[in-house]
Amino acid sequence: MKPIHYFDRAAGTVVTESVMGDGALRFAYETLLGRTLWPVLFGSKILSALLGRYYDSPRSRSAIASLAAIPGCLADEAEKPIGAYESFNAFFTRRLKPGARPLGDGVVSPADGRLMLYLNADADAPFPLKGATRSLREVFGPQGTPPVPNGRYDIAVIRLAPVDYHRFHFPCACRTPDPVFSIPGRYQSVNPIALIRYPDVYADNERQILACEASFGRFWLVDVGAFGVGTIVQTFSGTDHAKGDEKGYFKFGGSTVILITAAGALRYDEDLVRYAADGLETRVRCGERIAVSVDGAPHL
């Protein structure tokens, strides 16, 4: 498989992604035996639960140093020294030092990750991500696709990797009048190796969907579970949220946050649009600006 590249906003350059668990993922998704076993093992909530139990235990502390050594982990931003974390999951779900993610103006990224844009899409249009193709109708599943003016959507897919900060936040001031809608599913990896070989991740993995109301209209946040992520934890309470308020976190594994708005409600930053048009993800940090609201845009 070719190396995975993305544009790193902070570094101002295209970089090659370091993939944690590369060998195991290649076995699972690129060999006949692995593809035969994945429905029993690699898509199993039981296996995810067992991994979660291990990574919650003190025995897993030795794995922290390996993760911290991967380029891009930025372990120095953690609120505590590495040695103070009692388990791998405690480090994986770490909070950051105050000021580590200053809030930009406009609408900000809800998570650290690699962002790809799919603009002016309809509910049935497949939106690819490193070989994966899924439509919004399939992602929303039994809940049904929410109606929007002209039936067109802008979609920002933010793919987290193990090196990333795994708490996610509200991208703007908003209200959440309805509870989170959960869709159970398997636990597939959202690593690019897995996405190329198994393109149904965003419709088959567990999803938790939250409808939000902001000054520019309604939008949706979809949290997607992945292989090794036994739990998506929602930490927010109440119905009124400030920009940057914590919404929740993922336990061990890479995963994804999808931000969905009516087409044209936001004007995404030019660099994100440009690199997306070239098929390249952009690495963004939680709290940095990704878009601004558009005056006169249709509200939901």
Language model features: what each stretch is:
Residues 1-300:
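Contiguous, well-folded functional domains in the mature portion of proteins
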